[in-house]
């Protein structure tokens, strides 16, 4: 999540009910896990990017959609999606770029009937309360409509329709994305490109929760990754090993989450994001 530098301190009315203790405990947990970078001192540190060698055994979860879960306490999950499948449908939020109530990735997956859903664009929040209104801090395009403006110096992931199916493309900047011809059907801002033409780009080795996207086969194969205790380099290495030749980072930290069949893949306290990408399979439609 991207903090809003113009936020004023929120004022809350006294709570006069027997559930005060539980409410306070809830807010304490929220501030502990969402208002600062996650503390990974108690998590597995078994991932070693320098000696990484993963044998990806994909599990089919639907037509053209495959899942792989790492062995080390499910440190990460990666989904491989065949975008050339004509039965794929894209779901996305939000429907406008104004301040609005956020929803969790799980809630989004449920009401859109998405097989796979993942958080995308970084965002602003009015305050640090769990149900604060939010809005995207970067590019969002849905059904060719620009929902949120581009943000300078940050990357973008886009989807284009062609011949009854989709293909994806990753852009170094969001301005490059909106100036592309043809115009994207869907686009989501992120932070940085981490893998370009098969080359892993250098980043500081800071571990956190991560959400990322990768592409292969001329954009026809999409990889979506969500994991814990990972650096940007780790994400790039995992996606490259899975077959991607280009990849980028979505919003990370407490906002990271991916749902498959409406089940959360990261077991943690979630900050509800402003923008979500979902994949549906609609056979015979």
Model-derived features: positions:
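Short, low-complexity, intrinsically disordered N-terminal modules
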Residues: 3-6, 31
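Bacterial N-terminal signal peptides
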Residues: 23-31
């Amino acid at each position: 999540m991207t903090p809003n530098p113009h936020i004023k301190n929120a004022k809350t009315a006294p709570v006069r009910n027997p559930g005060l203790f539980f409410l306070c405990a809830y807010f304490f947990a929220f501030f502990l896990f969402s208002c600062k970078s996650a503390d990974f001192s108690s998590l597995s540190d078994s991932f070693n990017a320098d000696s990484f060698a993963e044998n990806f055994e994909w599990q089919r979860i639907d037509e053209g959609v495959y899942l792989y879960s790492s062995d080390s306490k499910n440190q990460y999950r990666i989904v491989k999606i065949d975008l050339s499948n004509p039965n794929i449908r894209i779901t996305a939020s939000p429907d406008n770029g104004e301040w609005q109530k956020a929803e969790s990735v799980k809630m989004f997956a449920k009401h859109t009937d998405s097989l796979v859903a993942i958080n995308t664009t970084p965002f602003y929040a009015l305050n640090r309360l769990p149900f604060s209104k939010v809005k995207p801090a970067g590019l969002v395009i849905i059904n060719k409509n620009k929902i949120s403006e581009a943000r300078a110096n940050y990357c973008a992931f886009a989807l284009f329709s062609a011949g009854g199916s989709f293909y994806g493309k990753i852009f170094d900047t969001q301005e490059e994305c909106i100036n592309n011809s043809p115009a994207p059907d869907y686009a989501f801002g992120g932070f940085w490109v981490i893998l370009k033409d098969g080359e892993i780009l250098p980043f500081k080795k800071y571990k956190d929760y991560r959400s990322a996207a990768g592409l292969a086969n001329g954009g026809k194969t999409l990889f979506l990754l969500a994991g814990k205790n990972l650096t940007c380099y780790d994400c790039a290495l995992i996606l490259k090993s899975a077959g991607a030749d280009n990849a980028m980072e979505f919003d990370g930290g407490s906002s990271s989450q991916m749902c498959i069949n409406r089940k959360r893949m990261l077991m943690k306290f979630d900050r509800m994001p402003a923008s979500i990408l979902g994949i549906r399979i609609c056979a015979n439609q």
